[in-house]
Amino acid sequence: MTKIVFMGTPAFSVPILESLIEAGYDVQAVVTQPDRPVGRKKVITPTPVKEAALKHNLLVLQPEKISGSPEMEKVIDLAPDLIVTAAFGQFLPEKILKAPKLGAINVHASLLPKYRGGAPVHYSIIEGEKETGVTIMEMVKKMDAGAILSQRAIPITKQDDVGTMFEKLSILGKELLLETLPKLIAGEITPIPQVEEEATFSPNITREQERIDWQKTAEAIDNQVRGMRPWPTAFTTYQGTNWKIWAVTPLTETTTSAPGTIIQRSKKALWIACGEGTVLQIDRLQPAGKGQLTIQEFLNGVGQNVAEKDKVD
């Protein structure tokens, strides 16, 4: 039986871990990030992967930094045949990558070499890609640069956001991993090197990237909103207060008004001018200190003073 150490952290990784257990692989240990404070009350909370591992009575290791840690030595002492990672969130030192006889592989949520890095799902949507997918690749010292073992694509629809794509890609990832592992173990896969010249990157989203640039087209802003939903959430500013923007609709109407201008405000609708004369309808938002509101709830409540020709930025 193939001995595996699994490394992962968020909900995306849980179905992948559970698929290994259900398929009968010997999961010797699970390495995940330390428990962290979560929410406004800063409640110390285990990672989704830790919760799943404990349900299966697996050994859980939680190094603050795995490089040079006692947990790293523990993984090496376990002498696994293979390390499988999925959104672990830390770099692995060469010492641990070379320890298993089959090496270490990663389940990455993009069609590598596109979108290496920590936010591939976000960028795939923000950049308006029509498809994304999962790549299983060998792990090397350089981030997400290892040779490809297998890859599969799925479409991104205009209804998808980060949440829906994470769910789809997690399922795709576990299916592809279970197809790939027997071939890898049997030595039947010839890894395909990535083309470095085609590599693009998806670093973690910054606060400034979350701010909506109304000079962009309505479609581009829609991509941004969906590519940051449900986290970290796109926002704009109205008269010094922030609005988180949760849902929008690009319209076919056009305008000559300056980008960021409110061009229609009724009891049920709020339209904003965008770049290239395009128009965006706001469907759902969250004013500072409030919960999410439909645009009708907002305009007839805390947003009743919002008027046409006002600006957002």
Swiss-Prot record:
Stated family:
Belongs to the Fmt family.
EC top class, as a word = transferase
User: So what does this thing catalyse?
Assistant: L-methionyl-tRNA(fMet) + (6R)-10-formyltetrahydrofolate = N-formyl-L-methionyl-tRNA(fMet) + (6S)-5,6,7,8-tetrahydrofolate + H(+)
Source species taxonomy: Bacteria, Bacillati, Bacillota, Bacilli, Lactobacillales
Which E.C. number(s) belong to this protein? 2.1.2.9
Keyword Transcription listed: no
Q: Specify which residues bind (6S)-5,6,7,8-tetrahydrofolate according to the UniProt entry for this protein.
A: S110, L111, L112, P113
**What's its job?**
Attaches a formyl group to the free amino group of methionyl-tRNA(fMet). The formyl group appears to play a dual role in the initiator identity of N-formylmethionyl-tRNA by promoting its recognition by IF2 and preventing the misappropriation of this tRNA by the elongation apparatus.
Keywords (alphabetical) are: Protein biosynthesis, Transferase
This entry's Gene Ontology molecular function terms read: methionyl-tRNA formyltransferase activity
State the organism of origin: Enterococcus faecalis (strain ATCC 700802 / V583)
Is the keyword Ligase in the record? no
> What is the designated name of this protein?
Methionyl-tRNA formyltransferase
Q: Name one GO cellular component term.
A: cytosol
HAMAP family (UniProt xref) = Formyl_trans
